[in-house]
Amino acid sequence: MKRTYQPSKLVRKRRHGFRARLATTGGRKILAARRARGRKRLSA
């Protein structure tokens, strides 16, 4: 059985990147929550 995490920079950016977060209402909520919490990095 192969491991489930097969790293890919492109997929990482597309799925969890800043632009991907801004594209949806839920994603914007995530960014707002991370800003409120004072996260140094908001997204991948």
From Swiss-Prot:
It holds the Pfam family Ribosomal_L34. GO terms for cellular component: ribonucleoprotein complex; ribosome. One of its GO terms (biological process) is translation. It comes from the Bacteria. GO terms for molecular function: structural constituent of ribosome. PROSITE patterns: RIBOSOMAL_L34 (PS00784). Belongs to the bacterial ribosomal protein bL34 family. This is Large ribosomal subunit protein bL34. The lineage of its organism: Bacteria, Pseudomonadati, Pseudomonadota, Alphaproteobacteria, Hyphomicrobiales.
